[in-house]
Amino acid sequence: MWIHFAPLKIPFSRRLQTGAVLQWAVSFLAMAQCCIALYILLLFSRYWYLAVLYGVWLYIDWDTPSKGGRRSNWVRSWTVWKYFAEYFPIKLLCTAPLDPKYNYIMGFHPHGVLVVGAFGNFCTEGTGFSRLFPGLTPHLLMLPAWFRVPFFREYIMSGSLVSSDRSSAHHLLSQKSGGQALVIAVGGPPEALDAKPGELTLQLLNRTGFIKMALTHGAHLVPVLSFGENDLYNQVNNPRGSLLRATQEKLQKIFGIALPLFHGRGVFQYSWGLLPHRRPIYTVVGSPIHVTKTPCPTREQISSLHSLYIAKLRDLFETHKGNYGIPEDRSLVLC
């Protein structure tokens, strides 16, 4: 396979964009492991007392990721995130105003390989979330295990990431002042195994937990479609029923995270690497579905709202797909 090298002469701004995405990729894929190693090294060094002090802090602060986290507007507004968003570029599009008097559950679709669009739009100000949705505080849900990693937890919480456990969602959606927006990648890690260029397969038909949560708390539902999310990485072919897919699904059940075999581009060449390709992401936030608080929803109520949500998501896709290069005969694939 021929390697397609990047040209030597490119605008400095593009180098800054690549650097911004490189630091994100390293943070996403390796920072947690490095933080664990750093803590162990610190524990067995002459500065062991610092590790002990941090361990005490970790014990005291253990539940913070389930109680709204510890966001930092300063971190969210770093200039690096502007370059991160410009790399693809990522665009956040508002189709209807969201009244900050209410709390919301935003269903983000698709998950993609590394949830790039959700991070860029809701964990940073790189695409201007606060300008588009004044009065709303976004919280992207992430697997609880990541918040047990020393040092790494502080970094991810600063960007509005919170634990995805039930108590975390309950805490945020119980805020009577409103203005809380929970962002849930509904398909979860399993959906990453279907994240391939040109495809849009969503795991949604059996996902009703977020629907019940919305009813229980009276949180309005907002479908969000991120066009281009699946085009950022190439993935080894793993059709359902294949040995590779069965192995991936088994490992996902054991470890709780998906393990897609993917590749993108490198820093100095476009053929292979862990950086995502420069392909646009258009994240379209749909109109809110108003939900009446129902503390003990029945199966029929959950099913009815779930069907309405799917219908609104399909409408959002059909309305906007032509704007982003998707053929008119293409439909969402739900499983």
From Swiss-Prot:
Keywords: Acyltransferase, Cytoplasm, Endoplasmic reticulum, Glycerol metabolism, Glycoprotein, Lipid biosynthesis, Lipid metabolism, Membrane, Transferase, Transmembrane, Transmembrane helix. It holds the Pfam family DAGAT. Disulfide bonds: none annotated. This is 2-acylglycerol O-acyltransferase 2. The chain crosses the membrane at residues 24-44, 104-124. It is an enzyme of class 2 (transferase). GO terms for cellular component: perinuclear endoplasmic reticulum membrane. Involved in glycerolipid synthesis and lipid metabolism. Catalyzes the formation of diacylglycerol, the precursor of triacylglycerol, by transferring the acyl chain of a fatty acyl-CoA to a monoacylglycerol. Plays a central role in absorption of dietary fat in the small intestine by catalyzing the resynthesis of triacylglycerol in enterocytes. Has a preference toward monoacylglycerols containing unsaturated fatty acids in an order of C18:3 > C18:2 > C18:1 > C18:0 at sn-2. Belongs to the diacylglycerol acyltransferase family.
